[in-house]
């Protein structure tokens, strides 16, 4: 994974988080999963994002996981850390302690439980972070949070932050599933910031626009397909009539349709438990819950069919 490039480039994986029987992070299995993905050619890892059940882990748990990965030999420059908490102190603590261990890339997004939060309040929140971290060698990415609803990051807040702290933000990460929203951000801000998406089904659209960087949850299970999708903007085959056939696009659509009606994290963890032949991967932290047995059975059959169609 290690490269000399600065910031997010190529395919970064929003890592699923393996848990032990006590629902604590299983650090050894996390390391092994990262090593497996690295062999497949991913560019880096995102820790404690939506697929990593980030909101379920405390600041100290996140710091401990980073430390253990570094001790096992994972490079700090191959990590991007979700550092959003409802409290400024926790966000600052995580960023400062991880940065002291060599990590430079951090993702922050609205984490407000207060329904009275305002644009001015969001600007003040992120401005305080920017002021406290000013002068440090950091890469800060602002991210949307669809769960924030009306209090999500919006163009007004972004514009004010750029006016006040332009040099401190590296890019914008759209965590919505709305391609139009991502394109709106590109039109408004691409001359000032890099614009990325975490929506796997939008990766092809971004690649066709020349953006060959993205954060993927599906890459936990299908890394090779996601790498090809992000790095290519051409159909891989042609029909007998010369018409372009997007084979990888068809495979990605099939994978998406397989799990689209299910909660994403439990579904992906179940698929990974099948792939690794390790039932321990099939654990989530409440308030998430596992898929029921009938859903498991259907998903297993669909995944076997998918793997057969994806085989070279």
Summary of predicted features, one role per range:
Residues 65, 161, 299-300:
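A structural signal for short hydrophobic/aromatic patches embedded in well-ordered alpha helices
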Residues 129, 161, 185, 271-272:
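Broad structural signal for hydrophobic residues in well-ordered alpha-helices, predominantly aliphatic
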Residues 29, 61, 121, 177, ...:
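Soluble or luminal CAZymes and related metallo-dependent hydrolases
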Residues 85, 200-202, 274:
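Short glycine-enriched loops at secondary-structure junctions
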Residues 134, 145-262:
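Catalytic alpha/beta core domains of metabolic enzymes, predominantly
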Residues 62, 66, 91, 126, ...:
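A general structural signal for well-ordered alpha-helical segments in protein cores
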Residues 2-152, 169, 288:
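Active-site beta->alpha loop and helix N-cap motifs at the rims of alpha/beta catalytic domains
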């Amino acid at each position: 994974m290690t490269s000399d490039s600065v910031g997010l480039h190529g395919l970064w994986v929003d890592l699923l988080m393996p848990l032990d029987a006590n629902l604590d992070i299983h650090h050894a299995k996390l390391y092994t999963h990262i090593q497996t993905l690295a062999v497949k050619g991913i560019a880096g890892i995102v820790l404690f994002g939506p697929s990593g059940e980030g909101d379920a882990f405390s600041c100290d748990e996140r710091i401990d996981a980073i430390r253990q990965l570094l001790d096992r030999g994972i490079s700090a420059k191959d990590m991007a850390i979700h550092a959003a908490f409802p409290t400024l102190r926790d966000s600052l603590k995580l960023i400062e302690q991880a940065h002291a261990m060599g990590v430079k890339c951090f993702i922050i997004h609205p984490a407000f439980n207060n329904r009275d939060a305002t644009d001015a309040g969001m600007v003040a929140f992120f401005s305080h972070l920017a002021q406290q971290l000013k002068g440090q060698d950091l890469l800060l990415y602002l991210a949307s949070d669809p769960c924030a609803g009306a209090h999500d990051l919006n163009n007004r807040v972004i514009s004010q932050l750029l006016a006040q702290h332009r040099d401190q933000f590296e890019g914008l990460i759209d965590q919505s599933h709305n391609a139009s929203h991502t394109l709106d951000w590109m039109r408004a801000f691409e001359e000032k910031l890099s614009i990325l998406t975490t929506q796997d089904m939008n990766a092809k659209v971004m690649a066709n626009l020349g953006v060959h960087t993205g954060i993927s949850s599906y890459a936990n299970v299908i890394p090779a397909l996601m790498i090809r999708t992000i790095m290519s903007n051409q159909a891989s085959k042609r029909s007998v009539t010369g018409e372009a056939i997007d084979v990888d696009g068809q495979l990605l659509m099939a994978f998406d349709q397989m799990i689209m009606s299910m909660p994403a994290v439990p579904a992906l963890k179940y698929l990974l438990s099948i792939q690794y032949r390790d039932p321990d991967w099939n654990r989530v932290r409440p308030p998430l819950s596992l898929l029921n047995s009938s859903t498991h059975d259907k998903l297993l059959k669909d995944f076997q069919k998918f793997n057969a169609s994806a085989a070279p």
